């Protein structure tokens, strides 16, 4: 009996040791091979092949993808029972897990994103009483706010009316970001390792980064920013000059104008979408032709370039350009910085350029500074 128990104990111990060694050995193999181990399954071969031609070619699969035992068992079940879809797509939980991995290498970009409105949570967006009391939530909201959510709007938030109170009903999702990194970035794509883009302001446009791409939840595919079109916009009947910077095409996917309302002057005359309609902020007036990213940081929408980047500090009329009556200085100003025109303030004509001495003479005297 003792011999049998000893043999059983040795057998169980050996099996446990083999399982532990096998598990850790397999994990080490898959982690250390930069995807070659993952590519041994035919479902993953194409994805590994693409990433080996991408800027993340020296990054291992497990550096970005969650690889718990539960995930591995789920993958094994799918592989064995043949339920693999024609094209493998990430679930929302997978994307959210990967977002936290992005900051391991992209700390600066992640910090900017996390500090800005693009990191807004599902609760902040879909339980906003100010918005929801005016406009009822609909599936189309998920196109930009929750493109990786796998269900319909009714599966995410209730009630679907303008009375409320509203609550995110999907457990564990309320405090997660609705617009993760992969909403605008495609990781598995071909391209060279990237460098810092030219920071100069451009009207014609710069070479667009390979990673910039819009994720379309209907097609469950990324569309590269360079392949997206730019809209034709009007100011009344006049065709507005729109920056040809290809990065701006990505912004337009969500910060978009609306078609003219039925019965409006623009609709009657078939002028087309108007600047400033919907969520559009296309520059017009003194800033016409300048792209979004000329002034804005794409990760947090903050202005990365001040007025003095392009303008002398003192304007032609002797006023500090950053203190003029525009929304740059005061968000409540009637003169939106995106559309301000000289004539908004100078209805009787533009004044002649003043000399520095004349401009200084108009300024209030401050002891120790200018007087």
Task: Show where each model-derived region lies.
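Short sequence/structural segments immediately N-terminal
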Residues: 1-371
């Amino acid at each position: 009996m003792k011999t049998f128990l000893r043999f059983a104990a040795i057998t169980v111990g050996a099996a446990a040791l083999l399982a532990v060694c096998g598990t850790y050995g397999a994990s080490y193999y898959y982690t250390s091979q930069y995807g070659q181990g993952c590519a041994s399954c035919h479902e993953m071969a194409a994805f590994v092949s693409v990433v080996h031609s991408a800027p993340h070619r020296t990054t291992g699969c497990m550096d970005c993808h969650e690889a718990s035992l539960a995930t591995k068992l789920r993958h094994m079940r799918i592989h064995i029972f043949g339920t693999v879809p024609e094209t493998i797509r990430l679930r929302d939980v997978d994307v959210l897990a990967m977002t936290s991995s992005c900051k391991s290498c992209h700390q600066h970009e992640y910090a900017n994103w996390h500090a800005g409105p693009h990191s807004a949570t599902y609760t902040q967006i879909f339980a906003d009483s100010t918005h929801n009391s005016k406009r009822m939530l609909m599936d189309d909201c998920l196109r930009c706010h929750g493109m990786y959510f796998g269900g319909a709007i009714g599966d995410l938030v209730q009630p679907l009316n303008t009375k409320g109170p509203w609550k995110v009903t999907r457990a564990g999702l309320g405090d997660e970001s609705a617009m993760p990194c992969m909403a605008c970035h495609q990781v598995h794509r071909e391209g060279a390792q990237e460098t810092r883009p030219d920071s100069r302001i451009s009207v014609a446009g710069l070479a667009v980064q390979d990673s910039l791409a819009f994720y379309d939840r209907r097609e469950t595919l990324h569309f590269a920013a360079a392949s997206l079109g730019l809209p034709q916009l009007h100011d009344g009947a006049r065709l507005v000059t729109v920056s040809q910077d290809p990065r701006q095409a990505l912004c337009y996917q969500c910060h978009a104008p609306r078609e003219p309302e039925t019965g409006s002057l623009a609709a009657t005359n078939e002028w087309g979408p108007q600047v400033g309609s919907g969520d559009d902020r296309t520059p017009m007036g003194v800033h016409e032709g300048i792209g979004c990213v000329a002034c804005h940081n794409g990760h947090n929408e903050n202005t990365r370039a001040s007025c003095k980047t392009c303008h002398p500090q003192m304007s032609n009329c002797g006023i500090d350009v950053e203190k003029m009556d525009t929304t740059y200085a005061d968000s409540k100003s009637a003169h939106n910085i995106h559309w301000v025109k000289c004539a908004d303030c100078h209805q009787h004509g533009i004044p002649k350029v003043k000399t520095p001495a004349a401009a200084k003479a108009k300024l209030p005297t401050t002891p120790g500074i200018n007087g």
